[in-house]
């Protein structure tokens, strides 16, 4: 295992306001520094205790020091008072202030989360107590940890690869059963093992092809069988394409299934968003064009996270800013998984055919629900007329009143049915990380070029160059071969919380 020389760090690992607080200490002097401020209730000092043990005791501040200048001017103080103050000084200077009674867990390198000597101090959750303990640790030689520094040290010390480290952040942020399963799957290393296996096979062929270059004078020599390499490239192409394709599902699970609420101005889109979120998220007004930019928020419905997007109303306008908002509406429609088309049922103009021409090109391959809003103001015959106009569209349709929350519960059920994402278990390998997706896309381009080079019977040095590029992209995901830049690592770990 690769160990790195570092200082010793400390941080509060638990959220404020809980009954129990935990402080993590990690580094070469973690046990020594912790023992300086900790007095065990019984037995050996902390430095002599075995790993994976819990020790009960107390955290104490250093002995108090009295300013001796107070007693230098004894001639100005009556003799009896001077003696009393000196006795008080003697008592105070020998006493220790107990901060809290605590439990301390002990881990010795390399068998800890970070791969370093580590302690975890479990105390009462008072913010005062936690800050006092942190100050004592820093006074005795610790440094306050940076965001994500514990997991970064675990990565640098070989306890996990980079994709597993990123999964830690996903696990912390998981808000549903599906996001939890995906994070756990990545943390267990299934994704990393599959990539490492592909990478090693490519390395084998690359080394054989480069060996041929050393014997370029003997053109008849062929160490790397081209048919076997072509079969391998086809297999790798299929695996990478499957992983990259899974990103659309993984991203929807992780960040919420994107649902675009679209329609004309004043159709009730913002009112619907507020009804779904059960809060006044968007401004509602009778003035046309009130929403000029997209408004997004998430909500969990029956265990499924949805990301609702309230968009600018679609209409002809000369307002430059409003037109920019309408352009973004179409962009969000292209990105959405589900589209809610809001229609003002009371609109006498009824320019539905024109709207269809604008909207439908952005809806191909997407789930759509047509919502006839303000249906509480319609007669039964009017509802029949509306249904007839849209009879040619084989999509879900629902009459609602966003303002009165009529049929909102039914809409929520239809949304869950429309989402219909595949069931996820901890053995599934599904991509949720944009960085991974982009690297896989580049790797796919490289393996395409390898296939083309083999078909065109290009020289081994040209084919091996594309092989090396594919290896590089796969290595970038898990940081094998030490090729990941310091900037990439910083961008990843700075998004972690302090204490993790």
Curated annotation (Swiss-Prot):
Binding site for Mg(2+): 270, 291
Subcellular location: Cytoplasm
Residues engaged in binding (6S)-5-formyl-5,6,7,8-tetrahydrofolate: 24, 120, 159, 500
Broadest EC class assigned to this enzyme: hydrolase
Gene3D superfamilies associated with the record: P-loop containing nucleotide triphosphate hydrolases, Probable tRNA modification gtpase trme, domain 1, tRNA modification GTPase MnmE domain 2
Family: Belongs to the TRAFAC class TrmE-Era-EngA-EngB-Septin-like GTPase superfamily. TrmE GTPase family.
Subunit record text: Homodimer. Heterotetramer of two MnmE and two MnmG subunits.
Alphabetized HAMAP family for the sequence: GTPase_MnmE
Identification of the protein by name: tRNA modification GTPase MnmE
Biological classification of the source: Bacteria, Pseudomonadati, Bacteroidota, Bacteroidia, Bacteroidales
């Amino acid at each position: 295992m690769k160990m790195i020389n570092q200082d010793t760090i400390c941080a509060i690992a638990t959220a404020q306001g809980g009954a129990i607080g935990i402080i993590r200490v990690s580094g070469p002097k973690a046990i020594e520094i912790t023992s300086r401020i900790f007095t065990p209730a019984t037995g050996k000092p902390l430095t002599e205790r075995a790993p994976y043990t819990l020790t009960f005791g107390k955290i104490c501040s250093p002995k108090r020091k009295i300013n001796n200048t107070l007693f230098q001017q004894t001639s100005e103080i009556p003799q009896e008072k001077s003696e009393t103050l000196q006795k008080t000084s003697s008592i105070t200077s020998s006493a220790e202030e107990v901060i809290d009674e605590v439990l301390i867990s002990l881990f010795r390198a390399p068998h800890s989360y970070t791969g370093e000597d580590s302690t975890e101090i479990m105390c009462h959750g008072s913010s005062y107590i936690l800050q006092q303990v942190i100050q004592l640790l820093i006074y005795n030689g610790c440094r306050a940890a940076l965001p994500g520094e514990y997991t970064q040290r675990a990565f640098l010390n070989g306890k996990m690869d980079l994709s597993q480290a990123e999964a830690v952040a996903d696990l912390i942020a998981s808000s549903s059963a599906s996001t939890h399963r995906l994070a756990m799957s990545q943390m267990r290393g299934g994704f990393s093992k599959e990539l490492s296996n592909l990478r090693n096979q490519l390395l084998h062929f690359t080394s054989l092809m480069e060996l041929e270059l050393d014997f370029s004078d003997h053109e008849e020599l062929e160490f790397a069988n081209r048919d076997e390499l072509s079969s391998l490239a086809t297999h790798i192409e299929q695996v990478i394409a499957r992983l990259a394709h899974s990103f659309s599902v993984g991203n929807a699970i992780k960040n919420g299934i994107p649902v675009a609420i679209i329609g004309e101005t004043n159709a009730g889109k913002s009112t619907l968003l507020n009804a779904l979120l059960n809060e006044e998220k968007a401004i509602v007004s009778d003035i046309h064009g009130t929403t000029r930019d997209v408004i997004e928020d998430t909500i969990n419905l029956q265990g499924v996270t949805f990301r609702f997007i309230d968009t600018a109303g679609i209409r002809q306008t000369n307002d430059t800013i409003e037109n920019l908002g309408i352009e973004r509406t179409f962009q969000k429609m292209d990105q959405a998984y589900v589209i809610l088309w809001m229609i003002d049922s009371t609109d006498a103009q009824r320019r539905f055919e024109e709207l269809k021409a604008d909207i439908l090109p952005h809806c191909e391959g997407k789930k759509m629900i047509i919502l006839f809003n303000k249906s509480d103001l319609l007669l039964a015959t009017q509802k029949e007329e509306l249904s007839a106009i849209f009879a040619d569209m084989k999509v879900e349709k629902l009459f609602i009143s966003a303002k009165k929350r009529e049929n909102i519960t039914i809409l929520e059920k239809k949304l869950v049915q429309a989402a219909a994402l595949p069931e996820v278990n901890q053995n599934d390998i599904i991509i949720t990380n944009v960085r991974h997706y982009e690297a896989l896309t580049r790797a796919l381009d490289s393996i395409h070029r390898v296939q083309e080079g083999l078909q065109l019977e290009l020289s081994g040095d040209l084919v091996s160059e594309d092989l090396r590029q594919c290896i590089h992209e796969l290595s970038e995901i898990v940081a094998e071969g030490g090729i990941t830049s310091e900037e990439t690592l910083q961008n990843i770990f700075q998004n972690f919380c302090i204490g993790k």
